[in-house]
């Protein structure tokens, strides 16, 4: 089964073709990071306009390598995300499905990120615990043996990625905050400053990062003699401590020995290092997608579309974009 995947939920325009849920035929992504850097974050209207510009170009490139008539299923993200951005990819996918007379599958963006880890690890079988951590989401999930997903914890305010972006802005480091803090923190001392770990001792599996961000703000207003590298490292350490502790606690309480980390923040080097240390110490199996599958991409959409199509779970052509779609 050949699936064409389209991703336009935020600021990456992506098109991919995947055969039988595992063989990559085409994979194109155009990032808008440089465009949004001057604004300090993603501007929804600007993102949508660039999707309109970039998507036809990527589809043309894809169909130069893959004859359109060989596509069996068309899949696209329909939520969650930015409504204008979502509509670009969703509308294109429906139009292609109609013109090619092929079935259409709407894909949940969060579920697609989870599928990225199965794409990268074909022999991986559930059940497993998954931490989805990105600029828009911080969720702890259980993937059941039938591949259904349950959200067991989530952020009550800012996502971890959003906290990275806001603290990077406070430190004058620019956008996007995750990669730049990761890079700058390598030169700093993560034990230099003690920032709070909100909800770390809470019995739930929920998160809160707004207070941590505010603590950094008050620190910067109060202190005059500090190194940006030390603040970045200490902030990053606080975030990583929260994410790692909550994730392993859930796995331990569920009796599950396999844990996956997906989403843009899963590319963070300190997170990966701390996770691997703890997994080795406590004998857990941990899985990360390769870096190129952590950020938004169309391969994960094609994979999710394949899994749904395999089960006959096609979508109606009147499916609408849902910016607040839940798992």
Swiss-Prot record:
<feature type="binding site">
    <location>
        <position position="182"/>
    </location>
    <ligand>
        <name>substrate</name>
    </ligand>
</feature>
<feature type="binding site">
    <location>
        <position position="268"/>
    </location>
    <ligand>
        <name>substrate</name>
    </ligand>
</feature>
<dbReference type="InterPro" id="IPR017861">
    <property type="entry name" value="KAE1/TsaD"/>
</dbReference>
<dbReference type="Pfam" id="PF00814">
    <property type="entry name" value="TsaD"/>
</dbReference>
<protein>
    <recommendedName>
        <fullName>tRNA N6-adenosine threonylcarbamoyltransferase</fullName>
        <ecNumber>2.3.1.234</ecNumber>
    </recommendedName>
</protein>
<feature type="binding site">
    <location>
        <position position="178"/>
    </location>
    <ligand>
        <name>substrate</name>
    </ligand>
</feature>
<feature type="binding site">
    <location>
        <begin position="132"/>
        <end position="136"/>
    </location>
    <ligand>
        <name>substrate</name>
    </ligand>
</feature>
<keyword id="KW-0408">Iron</keyword>
<feature type="binding site">
    <location>
        <position position="109"/>
    </location>
    <ligand>
        <name>Fe cation</name>
    </ligand>
</feature>
<keyword id="KW-0012">Acyltransferase</keyword>
<keyword id="KW-0808">Transferase</keyword>
<dbReference type="GO" id="GO:0002949">
    <property type="term" value="P:tRNA threonylcarbamoyladenosine modification"/>
</dbReference>
<dbReference type="InterPro" id="IPR000905">
    <property type="entry name" value="Gcp-like_dom"/>
</dbReference>
<dbReference type="GO" id="GO:0005506">
    <property type="term" value="F:iron ion binding"/>
</dbReference>
<keyword id="KW-0963">Cytoplasm</keyword>
<feature type="binding site">
    <location>
        <position position="113"/>
    </location>
    <ligand>
        <name>Fe cation</name>
    </ligand>
</feature>
<comment type="function">
    <text>Required for the formation of a threonylcarbamoyl group on adenosine at position 37 (t(6)A37) in tRNAs that read codons beginning with adenine. Is involved in the transfer of the threonylcarbamoyl moiety of threonylcarbamoyl-AMP (TC-AMP) to the N6 group of A37, together with TsaE and TsaB. TsaD likely plays a direct catalytic role in this reaction.</text>
</comment>
<dbReference type="GO" id="GO:0061711">
    <property type="term" value="F:N(6)-L-threonylcarbamoyladenine synthase activity"/>
</dbReference>
<keyword id="KW-0819">tRNA processing</keyword>
<dbReference type="InterPro" id="IPR043129">
    <property type="entry name" value="ATPase_NBD"/>
</dbReference>
<comment type="similarity">
    <text>Belongs to the KAE1 / TsaD family.</text>
</comment>
<dbReference type="InterPro" id="IPR022450">
    <property type="entry name" value="TsaD"/>
</dbReference>
<dbReference type="GO" id="GO:0005737">
    <property type="term" value="C:cytoplasm"/>
</dbReference>
<feature type="binding site">
    <location>
        <position position="296"/>
    </location>
    <ligand>
        <name>Fe cation</name>
    </ligand>
</feature>
<keyword id="KW-0479">Metal-binding</keyword>
<feature type="binding site">
    <location>
        <position position="165"/>
    </location>
    <ligand>
        <name>substrate</name>
    </ligand>
</feature>
